[in-house]
Design a protein with these regions (language model features):
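Class I S-adenosyl-L-methionine
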Residues: 3-456, 672-673
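Conserved S-adenosyl-L-methionine
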Residues: 34, 136, 163-167, 174, ...
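Short His-Asn-centered micro-motif
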Residues: 72-74, 158-160, 395, 460, ...
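Short, glycine/charged-enriched secondary-structure capping and boundary segments
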Residues: 86-87, 107-110, 171-173, 471, ...
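Residue-level recognition of the N-termini of beta-strands and the immediately preceding loop/turn
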Residues: 91, 153-156, 181-183, 455-458, ...
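Generic beta-strand/beta-sheet core signal
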Residues: 93-98, 157-161, 215, 460-463, ...
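PRPP-dependent phosphoribosyltransferase catalytic core
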Residues: 473, 477-673
Length: 673
């Protein structure tokens, strides 16, 4: 950009845009500044949806299963804009973008002015001095669009390593806001030192990578507990006392003694007569009546008693409180010390030892012999049905060899990235040219935590398809119904846009169980393979489509306001009917009166009679969804969609501004359908 050649008005406009971008991005906070920075919303507003084609040969599964998931081949920014029906509908964005390691992403400088330019640009080499600013310019509009795809309570989990960690973190703080940062996961990708020190003498071998996790709105986001492991549950047992419920010993004190002074007092052991107080700074975790009942479970009567142990405090009103101890009824104390040789203590010990031998001890006990301080039974049935995820995920989550029916292998190389490679090799075979693949367990764990069982997972940098594989695997194990959208451009250096030959192939193989390493249990499901075309969608382009092209567009763009992203049309085989081309989940038929731009497209009485007949043949509900250019006939059971108007509306076309995605609210009021 040459400022000398710009007019005064152009310079003023540029400064205004710059000030607006700084104001919106920073909101009085830190604002990133780099060469070629453009406000992401200014770029997004220029991106136009593209035509899509369904490749039935690559699609997998039954017709209704194909409608559940999407693998899309194409540039991801255009793809996300094209997937308008999913705007604001995604539960989790889980993705692994280019790490800027050198020649791992392409950038076209023309995208700054025209993001619709079809040229993908050149690979950015490691030696490029502007590689960081190019990476930021590449990522910024895509992250903005990922945020737009999320539900209000949606979450994004984005993988990165040390090369762009700091820049990505600042960018995420700008776009998602710092207050919406859930955490930064530090996962151990290797457990043995390697020669990789980042190209620097005296450097450190990189053993960890990171996942930055942000919510669209942290007040609406939900972090789910992970499933408990067998190892965790094995700590609970009932063989000690024969208790029918499994338990383990735990602390009977809690924090915040300063605000719970009445719960700081002595309790007397029924075995030894010794007095026990909570640890410094802590208080008993249970109410005093509960503690008294548990102590009396050992056979002796207890009482509240001031034992002159100086356990007192003054409240905020200046009132002095003497906190009484829980002691065996009838015992005598002098200055907080019990008088020795009391018969009450000997009798209490006899009763307590008898109870210990009989089994099923009270919840408060004094060790396995009665000689230690107080402990509390923690019952498995009372524990949360899961565990809270931490920000450090160590190697034990990823080192377990992947089982393939009767076959399994151990790691030939140290490092958890190799686990991902092994998993990919097992499914599709070697020779895929992928050197780094995320482990299946890593992605599965993230999905479990931040995507509900019937939610949608989006991966705009799908790569080898690990995210889709993980969704299917988690669904299969838990009986869930999560859906995925995978977007992959591929790399055409070798003439192979691997969205078909690798991404879709991996998903197909795990669905069917047809792994390269041998037959495995099929995970089930299906997906629709969509190809993003270069042709932009507008009224003229829609009106010029042939029938099969129009059907592809309708199948990929149609949504019902009452269901939005859950709207899925199952396509019927071509040639089955003259007008009927799909059905929805309510068994309602979708009919297309269209044979090309030069043929009549009219819903009249005669055509409607034929539509009713086709619906009866397929035993469909009496609700008819009809796409046509004109509709002189109408009826209470007819839902009419005008071509091209309603088609454009379903992909986010704003007719008032004659532009796409021009601040269109996804909940804009439209006619039902």
């Amino acid at each position: 950009m040459s400022y000398e050649q710009m007019t005064r008005s152009d310079l003023i406009r540029l400064l205004e845009q710059h000030d607006q971008a700084r104001s919106e991005a920073g909101k009085d906070g830190i604002v990133m500044s780099y060469t070629g920075r453009t406000a992401p919303w200014q770029i997004i507003r220029q991106v136009k949806p593209k035509m899509t084609k369904i490749n039935q040969r690559v699609s997998t599964g039954a017709v209704h299963e194909q409608a559940e998931n999407i693998v899309m081949e194409g540039e991801n920014l255009s793809a996300m804009v094209t997937l308008y029906k999913y705007r604001g509908q995604v539960d989790l964005v889980l993705t692994d973008p280019p790490y800027n390691t050198g020649e791992d992403f392409r950038y076209n400088d023309k995208w700054d002015q025209d993001p619709n330019d079809p040229d993908l640009g050149d690979l950015v080499p490691k030696e490029d001095g502007s590689r960081h600013s190019k990476w930021l310019r590449f990522m910024t509009p895509r992250l903005w669009m990922m945020r737009e795809m999320l539900k209000p309570g949606g979450v994004i989990a984005i993988c990165i390593d040390h090369r762009e960690l700091y820049r990505l973190g600042m960018l995420m703080d700008e776009i998602f806001r710092e207050e919406n940062r859930i955490g930064i996961i530090n996962w151990q990708k290797a457990y043995s030192p390697k020669s990789d020190t980042g190209g620097k003498k005296g450097g450190l071998s990189t053993a960890t990578e990171y996942v930055l996790v942000y919510a669209k709105d942290i007040d609406k986001a939900k972090t789910t507990l992970l499933d408990r492991t067998e190892e965790m549950d094995a700590r609970y047992q009932s063989t000690v006392d024969g208790d029918p419920d499994e338990w383990k010993s735990g602390d009977c004190s809690g924090p915040n003694a300063s605000t719970h002074r009445k719960m700081v007092y002595a309790i007397q052991s029924p075995f030894t007569g010794k007095l026990f107080y909570p640890p410094e700074g802590r208080c008993w975790a249970n109410e005093k009546p509960t503690m008294k009942a548990w102590l009396e479970g050992w056979g002796s009567e207890y009482q509240d008693k001031w034992i002159d142990d100086d356990n007192q405090y003054t409240d905020k009103n200046g009132k002095l409180w003497k906190v009484k101890a829980l002691v065996l009824k009838g015992t005598t104390f002098v200055n907080g010390e019990q008088v020795a040789g009391q018969k009450i203590i000997k009798d209490a010990r006899t009763l307590a030892l008898k109870k210990m031998k009989e089994g099923t001890w009270p919840p408060l006990f004094f060790g396995l012999t009665g000689e230690t301080g107080p402990q509390q039974k923690r019952y498995l049935k009372d524990v949360k049905k899961g565990k809270v995820a931490m920000t450090y995920w160590a190697n034990e989550d990823y080192t377990i060899p992947l089982n393939i029916e009767s076959q399994s292998w151990d790691h030939e190389e140290s490092g958890h990235s190799q686990t991902g490679i092994n998993e990919l090799n097992a499914v599709v075979g070697k020779g895929h040219d992928f050197k780094t693949v995320k482990p299946l367990r890593l992605m599965s764990k993230i999905i479990q935590i931040w995507c509900k069982p019937d939610g949608i997972v989006l991966d705009p940098f799908a790569g080898s398809g690990t995210t889709g594989h993980a969704v299917l695997d988690v669904n299969h194990k838990a009986g869930a119904n999560r859906r995925f959208i995978l977007i992959e451009q591929g790399n055409d250096v070798k003439g192979d846009l691997y969205a078909k030959t690798l991404t879709a192939d991996r998903i197909r193989r795990v669905i069917t169980g047809d792994w390269k390493a041998g037959k495995c249990s099929p995970l089930g499901g299906g997906f629709q393979f969509q190809e993003l075309k270069r042709q932009q969608v507008d009224a003229a382009a829609v009106s010029a489509l042939q029938r099969e092209e129009m059907i592809d567009l309708l199948l990929t763009s149609h949504w019902d306001k009452s269901e939005r992203s859950k709207t899925s049309l199952s396509r019927l085989l071509p040639g089955d009917s003259r007008y009927l081309f799909a059905v929805n989940s309510r068994n309602e038929g979708f009919f297309l009166i269209w044979d090309g731009a030069d043929k009549p497209s009219i819903l009249n009485r005669e055509t409607f009679k034929n539509i009713i007949q086709e619906a009866k043949i397929h035993s469909l509900a009496e609700r008819y969804h009809v796409y046509a250019a004109l509709a002189p006939y109408s009826g209470r059971t007819v839902e009419f969609y005008k071509i091209p108007d309603r088609v454009l509306e379903h992909i986010g076309f704003n007719s008032r501004a004659d532009a796409y995605n021009n601040d269109v609210d996804v909940d804009v009021e439209v006619e039902q359908g």
